[in-house]
Swiss-Prot record:
Family as reported in the entry's similarity comment: Belongs to the IL-2 family.
Lineage, highest ranks first: Eukaryota, Metazoa, Chordata, Craniata, Vertebrata
Source species: Macaca fascicularis (Crab-eating macaque)
Signal peptide span: 1-20
Gene designation per UniProt: IL2
Purpose of the protein: Cytokine produced by activated CD4-positive helper T-cells and to a lesser extend activated CD8-positive T-cells and natural killer (NK) cells that plays pivotal roles in the immune response and tolerance. Binds to a receptor complex composed of either the high-affinity trimeric IL-2R (IL2RA/CD25, IL2RB/CD122 and IL2RG/CD132) or the low-affinity dimeric IL-2R (IL2RB and IL2RG). Interaction with the receptor leads to oligomerization and conformation changes in the IL-2R subunits resulting in downstream signaling starting with phosphorylation of JAK1 and JAK3.
Disulfide bonds listed in the record: C78-C126
GO cellular component: extracellular space
Domain of life: Eukaryota
Name of the featured protein: Interleukin-2
Amino acid sequence: MYRMQLLSCIALSLALVTNSAPTSSSTKKTQLQLEHLLLDLQMILNGINNYKNPKLTRMLTFKFYMPKKATELRHLQCLEEELKPLEEVLNLAQSKSFHLRDTKDLISNINVIVLELKGSETTLMCEYADETATIVEFLNRWITFCQSIISTLT
């Protein structure tokens, strides 16, 4: 009688482990990665919103796609798809009075974190909203996304 329960318990445990059921350590790792992503996005936003940025009005003319719904880590696929355009806009805006240090490194860091968080198996097709967003709106929405996910993990 107990043997069947033990075998069921072992089978369930193996199923959970193989399906990468979240553990407290993986939750903590996810939270740390989200915090790093949040800081990188905030650093870019702060650089853009710097009062000395003469190219802000030009940067606001570029539009970015936002997902209709971004509530899960797998939705980071949509952020990943917009990283190249983001990098291009940031590079266009570089000047003597406005310079984001290591734009390429920041975008690379964001890309690495996003890939780790969403997982390599994600084949989500992003459903984008009808309206596009400015660079400031884009960054603010992804910052809010990170904060929202972090709050659910704590």
